[in-house]
């Protein structure tokens, strides 16, 4: 078995947008569950009104404006956590790119993009669908974007195994 070392930590979660905020919130027993704000839940058919949404996230702290526009929110969260982890590690620019790998866990990938583009198709027609539709939503794009950003040439993959995703990624 090969040795793997986790040298930095980053987090974007319903209780904090950094590892430090997340840890402090967990220690304090803070819940990240609250009313859904990401979409309208007023339809009587929508029985779920609560969720653990990420709050007050600003992707511009981690990505260029053009890259934000071409990426789904799940990928922006992954990039933010990766940037934080790299900063925490102190290794950025000081590591052999062949030894730097990226593993990202995503339960489903870019669902926001999928829903948005389906609505665009229905309301505006086929010609209005974004050329970035597929690259934005596929689950492995987050790992790919992170690998590109940090010039990682080691293993790069996305693990998509539902509730076991985080354990498999580690």
Task: Kindly give the residue locations of the regions a language model identified.
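Pocket-edge positions in alpha/beta enzyme catalytic cores
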Residues: 70, 161-162
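Short loop-beta-helix segment that forms the pyridoxal 5′-phosphate
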Residues: 155-161
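Short conserved active-site loop signatures built around small residues
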Residues: 166
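Active-site histidine-anchored catalytic micro-motif
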Residues: 169
């Amino acid at each position: 078995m090969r040795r793997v070392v986790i040298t930095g930590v980053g987090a974007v979660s319903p209780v904090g947008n950094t590892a430090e905020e997340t840890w402090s919130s967990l220690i304090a027993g803070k819940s990240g569950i609250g009313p859904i704000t990401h979409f309208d839940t007023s339809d009587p058919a929508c029985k779920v009104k609560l969720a653990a949404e990420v709050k007050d996230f600003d992707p511009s702290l981690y990505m260029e404006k053009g890259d934000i526009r071409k990426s789904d929110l799940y990928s922006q969260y992954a990039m933010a956590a990766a940037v934080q982890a790299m900063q925490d590690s102190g290794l950025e620019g000081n590591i052999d790119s062949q030894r730097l790998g990226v593993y990202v866990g995503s339960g489903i990938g870019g669902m926001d993009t999928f829903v948005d583009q389906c609505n665009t198709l229905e309301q505006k027609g086929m010609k209005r669908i974004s050329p970035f539709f597929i690259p934005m939503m596929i689950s492995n794009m987050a790992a790919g974007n992170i690998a590109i950003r940090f010039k990682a040439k080691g293993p790069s993959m996305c693990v998509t195994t539902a509730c076991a995703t985080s354990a498999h990624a580690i």
